[in-house]
Amino acid sequence: MAEPVLVVGLGNPGPQYATTRHNAGFMVVDILADRMGEKFKVHKKSGAEVATGRLAGRPVVLAKPRVYMNESGRQVGPLAKFYSVAPADVVIVHDELDIDFGRIRLKAGGGVAGHNGLRSVASALGGNDFQRVRVGIGRPPGHKSGASFVLENFNSVERKEVPTILEQAADATELLVAQGLEPAQNTVHAWG
């Protein structure tokens, strides 16, 4: 049997954060769970919400940490250990300030660019060899701080596009799981 892939959506728990930019990762893994016909349940050993099944023909564990974004590694590390998933088979889905709103980019390794959720995951996994599905949210307007911008809901113009963008991010995640990084990048990055 093939080794599972651990797909983790980053976000903050609680209804007050459910529709914020920082919760794009949660939103994408919710779509993937719906596609798989699976429901999230609390994983007792890690505390995260998990849904298991198959995606693109491979065994997959979807996860949403139930701690604040900056502490995500506290639950991602134990999940990777429990399911015997190597860091290279961990996919983190997250919001990305440094990518224009609506663009999806795939990446493996590299720096965390000030993203504290990624920093926490890298610390828990012993490095940043994991793969990433980066959902572009763009930079805040004017002199607004990135920290406050990511905790805001999408604006009224963005909200019209968000469902399509999240579906594309879910498609990109499926391609990454099915094809591996380079072929998936070639397809996804051609989307614009």
Curated annotation (Swiss-Prot):
The record marks 95 as: Stabilizes the basic form of H active site to accept a proton. TRNA binds at residues 17, 68, 70, 116. The gene is pth. It is an enzyme of class 3 (hydrolase). Its main location: cytoplasm. The active site is at 22 (proton acceptor). Its EC number is 3.1.1.29. Belongs to the PTH family. The lineage of its organism: Bacteria, Bacillati, Actinomycetota, Actinomycetes, Mycobacteriales. GO terms for biological process: protein quality control for misfolded or incompletely synthesized proteins; rescue of stalled ribosome. This is Peptidyl-tRNA hydrolase. The keyword Membrane does not apply. The keyword Oxidoreductase does not apply. GO terms for molecular function: peptidyl-tRNA hydrolase activity; tRNA binding. It comes from Mycolicibacterium vanbaalenii (strain DSM 7251 / JCM 13017 / BCRC 16820 / KCTC 9966 / NRRL B-24157 / PYR-1). It holds the Pfam family Pept_tRNA_hydro. Hydrolyzes ribosome-free peptidyl-tRNAs (with 1 or more amino acids incorporated), which drop off the ribosome during protein synthesis, or as a result of ribosome stalling. Catalyzes the release of premature peptidyl moieties from peptidyl-tRNA molecules trapped in stalled 50S ribosomal subunits, and thus maintains levels of free tRNAs and 50S ribosomes.
